[in-house]
């Protein structure tokens, strides 16, 4: 389980780093990086610091990591999935689709429902995986 947790944390770090530095697959845009002067960079630092704590101090270090991961998934839910499930105003939908218009989508963007792009779907899956593995380490 330790190896799985390390690999999941590394995968999440590398995947989320795309929010700092732009990732492309060929000419296709996966995510546009926002740089180090961004909320994304703060979140990456929080995740990295608490992940390190979880390995340096396993008896208590997993708790801050779990807190950061839960906070992160709640923020992501209200930025993406809340609008997918409950609907978005035309203005929100238009802004979201404009912001992510050039990114890779496995489900095409819609002008009726907010559909997260591939990057965010995988990001959310990795956060959830890390929550599960961290909770398992605490059990």
Where are these regions (language model features)?
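Membrane-interfacial loop-to-transmembrane alpha-helix junctions, especially the N-terminal start
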Residues: 2-8, 35, 61-65
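Hydrophobic transmembrane helix segments
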Residues: 10-41, 72-79, 84
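Membrane-embedded alpha-helical transmembrane segments of multi-pass integral membrane proteins
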Residues: 11-18, 46-50, 68-78, 126-133
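Alpha-helical transmembrane segments of polytopic membrane proteins
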Residues: 35-47, 76, 116-124
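Juxtamembrane helix-break-helix junctions at the cytosolic face
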Residues: 48-65
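Juxtamembrane non-transmembrane "cap" segments at the membrane-aqueous interface
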Residues: 80-101
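Individual transmembrane alpha-helices with interfacial aromatic-anchor signatures
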Residues: 99-126
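Transmembrane alpha-helical segments in integral membrane proteins
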Residues: 119-139
């Amino acid at each position: 389980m330790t190896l799985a947790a390390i690999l999941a944390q590394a995968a999440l770090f590398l995947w989320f780093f795309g929010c700092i530095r732009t990732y492309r697959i060929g000419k296709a845009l996966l995510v546009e990086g926002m740089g180090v002067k961004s909320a994304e960079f703060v979140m990456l630092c929080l995740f990295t610091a608490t992940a390190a704590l979880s390995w340096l101090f396993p008896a208590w270090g997993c708790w801050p990591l779990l807190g950061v991961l839960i906070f992160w998934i709640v923020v992501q839910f209200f930025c993406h999935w809340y609008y997918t499930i409950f609907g978005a105003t035309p203005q929100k939908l238009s802004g979201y689709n404009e912001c992510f218009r050039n990114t890779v989508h496995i489900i095409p963007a819609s002008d009726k429902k907010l559909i997260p792009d591939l990057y965010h779907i995988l990001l959310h899956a990795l956060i959830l995986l890390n929550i599960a593995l961290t909770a398992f380490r605490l059990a």
